[in-house]
Every structure is written in C-alpha cells, then in structure tokens.
C-alpha cells in the first residue's frame, strides 16, 4: 500500500528552462537533433563524441547556474572554452618529436575543434571582428588621453558592461579576450 502511494506522489514533471533564452534553446535543440541524426545514420564516431561532450558540458552549466538565466552568450563562452582546451591539447600532442599515436590524437583534437566551431558560428552573437570594431575606438581614446596603456583596467573601466549583451550582441568573455588581445598589441607597439 505504501509503495502505491509513493508511486502516485512521485510524478515526474518535464523540466522546463524558464530562465533560458530562445536562442539557447534552439541551439541545444539543434545539437540534440544532430546527435539523433548521427545515431540514425551511423555517421562519424568522433562527431558523436563531440556532441555528447557538448551536451554534458551544457548540462553541467545548467546545474551550476540553476538559479540564473542561461542565454546564447553563456553557451558561446562554454563552446569557446571547449575549443581553447582542444587547441591547447592538440598543440601538446603535435609538438615535434611526438610518437605517431600522439600525433593522431592531436589531429583528432583539431577535428573536434572543427565540429565545435560549427555550433559556435551558428549562435546569434557578434563575431570577433565586430567586437574588435567596438573595442578599438575605446582603446584609441585611452591612448589619446593617457598616451600609453599601463594596464588593461584602463580599457575595462570604459567598456559599457551593462549593454554588452543587448547592444553589442557579445558575451562578456569574448569582450574580455578582445580587450586583452588589443592591450597586448598596443602595449608592445608603445
């Protein structure tokens, strides 16, 4: 009798992401659909593993941020991080003097980067060139006023962080990476 009552109470409701944007949901639906197609047509095993790792990382992101809104910008940062990890490991595997089996692993890592990049480019966020076009005038204004760049904080303090997501259509991580890259570029020239 108790088990019957417990079964009635344990009704599982479907999980609904109220705090995620439609672009985030569409991107995940595309990734899941690609996984289904990969299973159905027995396509590339490496692609299937990459899609599974993307879904696992997004699940971890959802668990870590269960009380926060998830949007395409957080997914962009996640996919960018995954690409960076694979590029770093590929560089280690492909260095001169590595055994052939390590080199093959490095080439597989670079193939994984291609698959992840496909999903990264499908997100409705600003490209690196568009972000650089918005950060460049800020760097130039700092250079005009200060004469040289002493630290990246001078640039970071002038970025309108509250409107980066809405107006710039960029993630904060992508803007930070662009600022640091431009800072290093102009710092060495000065």
Swiss-Prot record:
User: InterPro entries recorded for this chain?
Assistant: Asn/Gln_tRNA_amidoTrase-B-like, YqeY/Aim41, YqeY/Aim41_N
> Where does this one sit in the cell?
Mitochondrion
Q: Name one GO cellular component term.
A: mitochondrion
Q: Which Pfam families match?
A: YqeY
Q: Where is the transit peptide?
A: 1-26
- What are the UniProt keywords, alphabetically? Mitochondrion, Transit peptide
| Keyword DNA-binding tagged | no
Q: What is its main location?
A: mitochondrion
**GO MF term list:** carbon-nitrogen ligase activity, with glutamine as amido-N-donor
Q: Which family does it belong to?
A: Belongs to the AIM41 family.
* Protein name listed in UniProt: Altered inheritance of mitochondria protein 41, mitochondrial
What taxonomic lineage is listed for the species of origin? Eukaryota, Fungi, Dikarya, Ascomycota, Saccharomycotina
Which gene specifies this protein's sequence? AIM41
